[in-house]
Amino acid sequence: MAKGLIGKKVGMSQIFDEQGNIIPVTVLEVGPCAVSQVKSVENDGYEAIQLAFQDTKEFQISKAEKNHLAKASLGPKKVLREFRSFGDSPATGSVLKVQDIFAVSDVVKVTGVSKGRGFQGVVKRHGHAGGPGGHGSRFHRHPGSMGANSTPSRVFKGVKLPGRTGSQQTTVRNLKVVRINEEKNLVFVSGAVPGTTNTVITIEKI
């Protein structure tokens, strides 16, 4: 069985627990996911399950993807992801739903692409304190010294400088499943998840 599923981010909300405390949650629409391929040690060198998510139109996928999905008797799918398997593997072409993998109180990790922020300076990108705020200072939000002099006469790789921020694959771990809506395939996890509304995510048990 796979240890995770594919889904998309719906948005954030809040719910109340039995003690009346507010819990901020992220709502995820998870699955149903079809099994497009089952990998084995004999054929592939490792065990894994490839899942397909979200129907799409035929012209939006390549011919190779179309033939690959046809082997599992599946129509065009927008997203393919692979998960390491454990225990008995489901049959190719079968469908996995939320209740097959997750339960309330499970601890999970969620992977998605973070929001893109464009080109940002060191204060926003790396959290630098910046310089004095007074009028006499000519140094407010600049990077400052980069730590190189006549030897070695260059800036080392990896120095925290301005640049393109966000829009990177990010994983948030140790999120707790607070609630599950099986009818609408919704999973409510505590805390925040990378990305914007409709960002494709993967959710896995830890």
UniProtKB/Swiss-Prot annotation:
It comes from Leptospira borgpetersenii serovar Hardjo-bovis (strain JB197). The keyword Ribosomal protein applies. One of the primary rRNA binding proteins, it binds directly near the 3'-end of the 23S rRNA, where it nucleates assembly of the 50S subunit. Part of the 50S ribosomal subunit. Forms a cluster with proteins L14 and L19. This is Large ribosomal subunit protein uL3. The keyword tRNA processing does not apply. One of its GO terms (biological process) is translation. Keywords: Ribonucleoprotein, Ribosomal protein, RNA-binding, rRNA-binding. GO terms for molecular function: rRNA binding; structural constituent of ribosome. Belongs to the universal ribosomal protein uL3 family. Residues 122-154 are annotated as: Disordered.
